[in-house]
Amino acid sequence: KIDIFTNKIIYEKNHFNFPKLDNVSFNFEIDDKILGSADCIMTDVFNSMNDKDDKEALLKRFMVDQELMNRTSDTAVFMHCLPAKIGSEVSNDVIKGSKSIVLKQAKNRMVAQRGVMKWLEL
């Protein structure tokens, strides 16, 4: 089962079209009990990196910051597929902090992509 946490305001503004998927639930609130049991906090922007309208201000309201990460378990990590909008979707202290594994994630992605490219050569 996968739980996806997002914000009701974003959903109501139809920024996303959520598909109907089996075993997936959408939760519109951040529950401290769930944060405390999370293994990973991952964020990404679902709009163009070039958008300069009101979506930028909307992002800041839901930024992953140190206060949110402090509510997670000691072993929880922060992930992002990069590039990140630092100061809008994630704070500088989180993305560069001890719980962040974004650079390891990027390195693993490069290795996987090289493997796919090598496989496609055959």
For every predicted segment, state its role.
Residues N14-N17, D53, R114:
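Short, well-ordered secondary-structure micro-motifs
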Residues I30-I34, K60-T72:
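A short, acidic, amphipathic alpha-helical segment used as a generic capping/interface helix at domain edges
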Residues V45-M63:
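Glycine/threonine-rich flexible loop motifs
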Residues K1-T43:
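Glycine-rich phosphate/diphosphate-binding loop of Rossmann-like nucleotide-binding domains
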Residues T75-A76, L82-L122:
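Adenosine-phosphate binding glycine-rich loop
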Residues I2, F78-M79:
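Hydrophobic/aromatic residues located in beta-strands of well-ordered beta-sheets
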Residues I4, Y11, Q66, A106-K107:
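Donor-nucleotide binding loops and adjacent catalytic segments primarily
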Residues D44-V45, L82:
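Glycine-rich, N-terminal phosphate-binding loop of Rossmann-like dinucleotide-binding domains
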